[in-house]
Amino acid sequence: MSWQTHTVFNQPGPLNNSNLFLSDGALREALVREGAGWDSDLLASIGQQLGTAESLELGRLANTNPPELLRYDATGTRLDDVRFHPAWHLLMQGLCANRVHNLPWEEDTRAGSFVARAARFMLHAQVEAGTLCPITMTFAATPLLQQALPAEFKEWLTPLMSDRYDSHLLPGAQKRGLLIGMGMTEKQGGSDVLSNTTRAERLADGSYRLVGHKWFFSVPQSDAHLVLAQAKGGLSCFFMPRLLPDGQRNAIRIERL
């Protein structure tokens, strides 16, 4: 007895082993029109790699194996670490290798680099979307940090501008690559960040101690976060590293993912 009830038709086949760039006429035309045609060869290479069955499988694995919050180690020591499936790390390696997080901020950047970066972003987005969050925040934070990074963290600029992904828990200056997250929103302060209650107290050495909470603390495994807090003169933005300059963990507590 057959259990077949119908025949599947009028459905596209699996998207396997296609070039995500060369098959996108609109993207190729826009790239040239907006002044980034010089990146076409590299984008074709990226599109070929991302369109493979193996690459698309990485996206599936990263989404079906969500990150895990590890609050404590076996001895009861507080960690607040986030563990990811290996597929996540491989996807992040590709994004950083293709400089989706910092291409326009290079000293010798070319005209049209924002367009080229956007095209690379679009190709990666077709494989997996979650990894684009840390990449986008790092991209947005980099020009600010290039101008205003505290003196004791200036050595971070080299790994910040690298094409490497480094998931190790190390002081920023010792890493091959960095990620920057953001902590803006609070329970009572969503779009109205002026209502944030996190406070910043200036210490004798010129640094600040932040006390408060964040409703969203995006990419908690980042090497540092830009955090909004109320200082003496009003709302301001602070650079908060995951590890302090002496290598100790900062007092950041993650409640849930």
Summary of predicted features, one role per range:
Residues 136, 177, 193-195, 220-222, ...:
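Short, solvent-exposed loop/turn segments at the edges of secondary structure
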